[in-house]
Amino acid sequence: MRINPTTSGSEVSAVEKKNLGRIVKIIGPVLDVAFPPGKMPNIYNALVVQGRDNEQTNVTCEVQQLLGNNRVRAVAMSDTDGLMRGMEVIDTGAPISVPVGGSTLGRIFNVLGQPVDNLGPVNTNTTSPIHKSAPAFIQLDTKLSIFETGIKVVDLLPPYRRGGKIGLFGGXGVGKTLLIMELINNIAKAHGGLSVFGGVGERTREGNDLYLEMKESGVINEENIPESKVALVYGQMNEPPGARMRVGLTALTMAEYFRDVNEQDVLLFIDNIFRFVQAGSEVSALLGRMPSAVGYQPTLSTEMGSLQERITSTKEGSITSIQAVYVPADDLTDPAPATTFAHLDATTVLSRGLAAKGIYPAVDPLDSTSTMLQPRIVGEEHYETAQRVKQTLQRYKELQDIIAILGLDELSEEDRLTVARARKIERFLSQPFFVAEVFTGSPGKYVGLAETIRGFQLILSGELDGLPEQAFYLVGNIDEATAKAMNLKT
């Protein structure tokens, strides 16, 4: 018999005596289980399938529906291979619970909180259920402050809020995961902050790359694992929909403990929140619910709200969440990204057009927004610089049709100057990443906010009009651009 990893043996044996059901139907990852009259488990309770003839099984399920006639419908958190009708099922009497606290740092977990990194069991008895209420209104902290990332385009145009929710929007292959990896790297090095990474329905290869990158950069300390700065929770593409639907909650539960009990500021990375919605859609169809717009589940807003409302700042500490959002067919009006938009403080939109030009990070400076870009929060200097950068880029965008038809020579002198500066700004928004050193051959750069503002002010003022635009491509601060220009001239 397999014991739920978050329930001790004595508790299981006590439950075993009073609440045992049997599988009556299996449809893929969905099980129907019959229980004795009056002993129905609650919604979200964890059920453990008991193997026949003392054979161990590895299947934990979560109750999703009460069907009547003493039957429940549950969704499996792992493959249901080998399960048969008539197998006994134990009601654990509680939701899935996962280990929390400092012992989780430097480790990789699955949706059930079991370590999957071959480094032995987790040294903690402290567990927490993955289903909880959001903090009460009175507990929330409403202070506004900027979260510096060291990435120029992000810090200048859609600045991130400490304790806020940020969405990285983009189609396939524009650099969402790479940007998340760079943010984890920069934040661990510059701020020494703790991070929890939730890999929700993404490529296993990317999860492996992230783990190896963490070890190389020292975010995961191989010599002394408890000194690590990140906990990783994976429910990747090959997992059943139940695991992909709940792995985000597992990561969030670990982050909540650091916030509420350790009173720390913690970062929660979710890659990819669209896969959370997609898994919910699969589960909804398997449970027989009528689909809503574009085939999504009718409970889309509720499911998204129950996750997002728990990601917040309280008087004890904060959770700053950065979520990659895959945009199907680059359509921002799709219900999944559109529902996510409502919860975010900042949106960083990644553009395929910029990626095609080789400008990385491919953050669209005009589409990306932030509620923090206000003079009373970021200061007049930052606000004015950001607005002038946007105006210059917007004017360049308006002129592109004329340039394509008539050429640059037909523009006025003022417009030609605007185009030249906009092209320099566009290239200066690119930046070499630490986590992409292997691909680019350029060492990564962390650029402070003051340096970023100074650089763009110099371009806008016209002081650097004489420098070639390629000098601004893939550099850190403005001094590197001027040095690169000198090298290009010689």
Curated annotation (Swiss-Prot):
GO terms for cellular component: chloroplast thylakoid membrane; mitochondrion; proton-transporting ATP synthase complex. Its EC number is 7.1.2.2. It comes from the Eukaryota. Keywords: ATP synthesis, ATP-binding, CF(1), Chloroplast, Hydrogen ion transport, Ion transport, Membrane, Nucleotide-binding, Plastid, Thylakoid, Translocase, Transport. PANTHER family: ATP SYNTHASE, ATP SYNTHASE SUBUNIT BETA, MITOCHONDRIAL. Produces ATP from ADP in the presence of a proton gradient across the membrane. The catalytic sites are hosted primarily by the beta subunits. This is ATP synthase subunit beta, chloroplastic.
